[in-house]
Amino acid sequence: MSTNHRPQLESKRGKVIKIKDTIQHARGLPQQTSIKYRQDIKNEKTINKFDDLQKHDNNKITSLESISPPTKKLKIESTKEITTEPLNQEIDKQSKLSLKNDDQSDIQPNEKSESDEEDSKDEEDDESSDDDDSDDDDTALLLKEIENIRREKEKQNSDSTNNSINNSLTLQTHDSSTKKKSWRSSTTFNNKSKKESTNDRNNNYTTDTLNSQHHQKFMSKYIR
């Protein structure tokens, strides 16, 4: 990357510059014009700054507290009319009603309990007989299913053994009859080379020009 877009520093231009530019580089400017005091050591300036900040925060809090949320108008409900009857009469009426209800509730459960017990006994007897019959049927069905599963497993095992025997026999016959040919025999270049080799024995063809038949004939005819 090039840095031609950046202004050149004075250290590269030299000490004496005849034409001064208005451009000032950030590195040439003063970096810090004010003194920074340590905050962990208490000085007059740091204490005054802290007090000012604390006062400012307190003023904000008080201003926020002074602002009250908008109040809703409450509707005043009309007062109910006060009854003139004394409280003692009402209490007596309630106690009498409760006693009557208790007496009726004690009589009715006793009659119901006897009838419920008889009905429950009859229902239990019927349910027990039905459960026994259903259990017998379930056991018979389970035994049948178990027998069917066993038969299926035996068939699968016999089929697998037969298949393995047949496969082994077929492999033996294939090995004895024919052997696998290599992939090289099916290639075109291999077949061509064999054909050419048989022809070369008869023609004595060579790529060497000195040992070729044509060259030897030429030499014997015109030179020797």
Swiss-Prot record:
Name of protein: Pre-mRNA-splicing factor CWC15
**What domain of life does the UniProt record list for this protein's source?**
Eukaryota
What functional role does this protein have?
Involved in pre-mRNA splicing.
**Keyword Cytoplasm found:** no
Picking any one GO molecular function of the record gives: RNA binding
What subcellular compartments does it reside in? Nucleus
Which residue ranges are recorded for the region named Disordered?
1-37, 52-224
- Listed transmembrane segments: none
Return the GO cellular component terms, semicolon-separated: catalytic step 2 spliceosome; nucleus
Q: Where is the signal peptide?
A: none
Gene symbol? CWC15
Q: Give me the stretches of Basic residues compositional bias.
A: 214-224
Q: Name one GO biological process term.
A: mRNA cis splicing, via spliceosome
Identify the keywords attached in UniProt to this record, alphabetized: mRNA processing, mRNA splicing, Nucleus, Spliceosome
The similarity comment for this entry is: Belongs to the CWC15 family.
Principal localisation = nucleus
Q: Which Pfam families match?
A: Cwf_Cwc_15
Organism, per UniProt? Candida albicans (strain SC5314 / ATCC MYA-2876)
**How is the quaternary structure described?**
Associated with the spliceosome.
Compositionally biased region (Acidic residues) = 114-139
Q: Which InterPro entries match?
A: Cwf_Cwc_15
Q: Biased composition, Low complexity: where in the chain?
A: 158-168, 200-211
